[in-house]
Structures are given as structure tokens and as C-alpha cells.
Amino acid sequence: GTGDYRTLTEAMEGIRAFMDYKVTVLVKKGVYKEKVVLPSWLENVDFIGENVENTIITYDDHANINKMGTFRTYTLKVEGSSITFKNLTIENNAARLGQAVALHTEGDRLVFINCRFLGNQDTIYTGAKGTRLCFLNCYIEGTTDFIFGPSTALFHNCTIHSKANSYITAASTPKDIEVGYVFKNCKLTAAPDVDKVYLGRPWRPYAATVFINCEMGKHICPAGWDNWRNPENEKTARYAEYGNTGEGADNTNRVKWVKQLTRKDVAKYEEPDYLFKICSEWKP
């Protein structure tokens, strides 16, 4: 069609390094089959799609291609910071052949608004300790551990869709970082035949994951959480819930090592300073 660039990679090469002013890249609808890396020198850029359903960045690498491993399978890798993505679909459309990452983040202060993340195992890898991410009004789907990694990330008003009986999150929050994954006002849905999904299992011992005021379908199993075959993780994992609704939110048979938060506990999750105080002040 008409535009200044034909691919995202071309568009990025037209942007100056470490800019102190904001640049907006408008992405016309279409299917962009490319593996995109936004390098660490890219900052202060907004990528805005024309329409989330029809503006698709897709690739199909998976972990079992030539010993590729999980961490090189991404469709979109974001190494830059202070970048916003809006109205885009990021997809890894590999068949179910092992880990296949759609989004891999390394940068800080990344915001995703009204985006869709499509894949199977390991859809979103929040890959860097001490980085902060914000997902607003997004749709995220996958099979196993499809939101995983060490970053601090807020998921607000998102739909989290399980395509298989498995685990939603696998946080690897470092011990010295208080906030890992926070799901607020999200809707947890599943494919028709899915009936046994766990909210999370700890990829590392101090995994931190909280669900607040979320609507949980009946596919969420009564125990809620899994210790990843290691009872020692029950002493260290920081898992909590508050005010959730729906059949999957019944905590009568929840594992004993998950914390049920009080209203006072939850109040601090309203504070951007608390959520994102890891380093410099940031209010997305």
C-alpha cells in the first residue's frame, strides 16, 4: 500500500538513536511476516496499528528448530525502553511444537494498549530483571507458562485465554524485587474443552504473582497454584489473590501457601509508586 516504509524493520532504521522527543510510527493494516528486533538505542517511540484485528506482526520460529531454544523464537523482541504499542497483533503462529515466543521484552517502561498476543507455549517472555511493563486492554492467549519471566508487569482489563490444560504464569521474580506480575480486573477465559488450568507455578523460588478483582472461569482448578514439583517453593513463592469472581475464584480448596489479601494489602497496588518503584519514578 501507500506508506513511507514497507516493514517495521525499515521504519525503525529511519528513527534516530536515543531521541529525547517522541516519534509515532503508524502501522497500516496488513500482515507483516517478519522477525523484528527493536534495539536498545530505540527510545520514545509509539507504534500505533490501524486496527488490532488486521494489523498483524507474525513469525513462526519455535524452540525445536535447529536447537534454537526458547529465547530466540520471538516474533517481536523489544530491547529499547519508553516504547508504546497500540492496536497491534503480535503472533507466533508456529504449530504446537514446543516453546514459541510472540513477544520478548528486555526494555523498561514498555506499554501495550489494546494489543493481541497470539501463540501457544511461552507467548510472552518478560525477559529482564528490574524492567517495568504495562498491558492495558490486551488479549493474551497460550497453552503453557504463556506469561513468564522476571519483570514487573501490570495487566489491567486484559483477557487471558487458556488454549490447553496447563499453567498461565511462570514468574521468575528476583528475591529483591517486591512486585512481579499483577493482574487487575482481568477476565480469565478458556477454549471449550479446557477444564484444569493453574494460575501459576514458580519458575524461580521467589515468583511473585497477584490476581485482584479478576473474573475467573470454571477452567481454573480449585487448588489454583502449583509448586512446580518442589515443596520448597511453597515457602518462598509470593502468590496472592483478592476479590476475584466467577467459578474459578472459589478459594475454599486453594493451596494453603497462597495469600488471601486484605483490603489494606490491596490498596498499595493502586499506587504506581509501589508497583513500579523498582528504579526511577514512572507512571504509565
Feature-to-residue mapping (PLM):
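Sequence-level preference for short, compositionally simple segments enriched
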Residues: G1-P284
